[in-house]
């Protein structure tokens, strides 16, 4: 007997006179990927079967039989008793075929009024909803860790940077609160997407709806969707929600990647601002002294994967005519990979950050000796009614003088300061202390200790 004759009959096979080519079947099979959707597929099928029974499209007994059978199939998949193979074409076929083996002819009524198109669209939205909630939870955990770090280091002074050059002193707590804000917007983006994703496509069928007296609103209610599709073509033929999800994840990964860059730099011997627990570092196979921030490096590297997934999806969808096209099957690998990569990156990165600490003695020494207080000199002169551009020019000359004479700004004498401007008096030295500089900031959301405390309190109240 040939391989072709041994092949399982496919759900759509009856119209064709020849069996589907085996290599073509293996090429088009997606069960090795969409197997991840088995929970969502069974969840959607239970809702559909329940609605069919309630509307009298199938009998109440058949509906109950299908629902119980689907629950049994789910248990078999979870226990490993039912293992999909590529000949099954996709996870939906696996479930339906096994259901037929368990309950007999009633299984054939499950697909009444439903197409694979609205079935897959429903599964995808359920998957998006679950993973949105998962990622929002991880982002909130990250924010909680960052709040704890901000609280711990709110009175620690360190450099803020622009162009990777020391710029001005700031509260280290202010740094952590910046990340808190960024991850907060990431969570907001996902929460906003959830509203659009939480609409049921069930009832759209292939793309035109169904002649059967379906009740899409009831299916939506059973699946805890907020509403029903407005247009049946749109319900099955777009993947903008998948693209939006991967885009939102790309933003999360971008933030994690930037944060990783700081961790990598700050844990280097050249910076030595930050120490990381041995539990989240690796060594070298040849250099015994090495302690590498590999988790941060991997997160930074995995960001490229998620960016690639976004471009993958945009490219898949860019030329497709309405409504459904088989190309859309290829949305699953980038979607699933993005969800898992982003979730695992958030989880391990948060735990790593939890086990880091700032080297406060080094930060205090460096900020006291640095030229990063130059802006304070310029603003001191502005308070003396000198136009800012003139104050900036004068301060630039003072900085050049300090570099030439190997002095720090606080060690320049008053007589020396007065050679640059008669406006200087003893008060300049009050401004040339890192803590005074930080706490002199008056604008809302600034880096002063008081402002950081307010940011922390507001964030804790809203969390």
Swiss-Prot record:
Its main location: cytoplasm. It catalyses: 2-(N(omega)-L-arginino)succinate = fumarate + L-arginine. GO terms for cellular component: cytosol. It is an enzyme of class 4 (lyase). InterPro entries: Arg_succ_lyase_C (IPR029419), Argininosuccinate_lyase (IPR009049), Fumarase/histidase_N (IPR024083), Fumarate_lyase_CS (IPR020557), Fumarate_lyase_fam (IPR000362), Fumarate_lyase_N (IPR022761), L-Aspartase-like (IPR008948). Disulfide bonds: none annotated. Pathway: Amino-acid biosynthesis; L-arginine biosynthesis; L-arginine from L-ornithine and carbamoyl phosphate: step 3/3. It comes from the Bacteria. Belongs to the lyase 1 family. Argininosuccinate lyase subfamily. This is Argininosuccinate lyase. It comes from Chlorobaculum parvum (strain DSM 263 / NCIMB 8327).
